[in-house]
Amino acid sequence: MFLSERHLKEKFWENYNYSGRALRYEFESPIRDGNADLVTIEIFQDNVQINAFEFKLSDIKKAILQAKENSKYVNKSWIVIPSEKENLILDRYKSYLKEIKYVGVIVVEESGRWKMIFKPIFRKNINIKNNILKLMLQEI
């Protein structure tokens, strides 16, 4: 059980990016009114992919709404929640997630191990904000 969103975010990030999969990343990225918790620039199947992540311990509705808004500016948008919320997502929100298409769900165990329980569709046409361009152009 995570006591804070910060702890959830740190554990997830430590395990998600252990191999350096994110070429660029920014926490609290201003891609919309209010920030996305994390934005990454990655190469996946030989294509550039921009991801946004929202971390929540509770208030799943808010997380989904934020991720839905983020999805306009990225290829894939994710909510990242503790693993004990998995059944809640599958029982209560799965049909809504299918409807909005571009939002996926990742659950994280206390150890940091994570799994995708709902896969979003890749959005090809996105509104690229200036801060995402700046992030992409930063030197490694």
Regions found by a protein language model. Give the residues of each.
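Non-catalytic C-terminal interaction segments of nucleic acid-processing enzymes
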Residues: 99-140
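A generic structural signal for short beta-strands and their flanking turns/coil linkers
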Residues: 34, 49-51, 75
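A generic structural motif
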Residues: 41-43, 108
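Acidic-basic catalytic patches of nuclease active cores, encompassing PD-(D/E)XK
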Residues: 1-34, 44-46
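Conserved catalytic cores of phosphodiester-cleaving nucleases, focusing on short active-site segments
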Residues: 12, 38-40, 49-59
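Catalytic cores of nucleic-acid endonucleases
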Residues: 57-108
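Short loop or secondary-structure boundary microenvironments that flank
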Residues: 2, 29, 56-57, 83
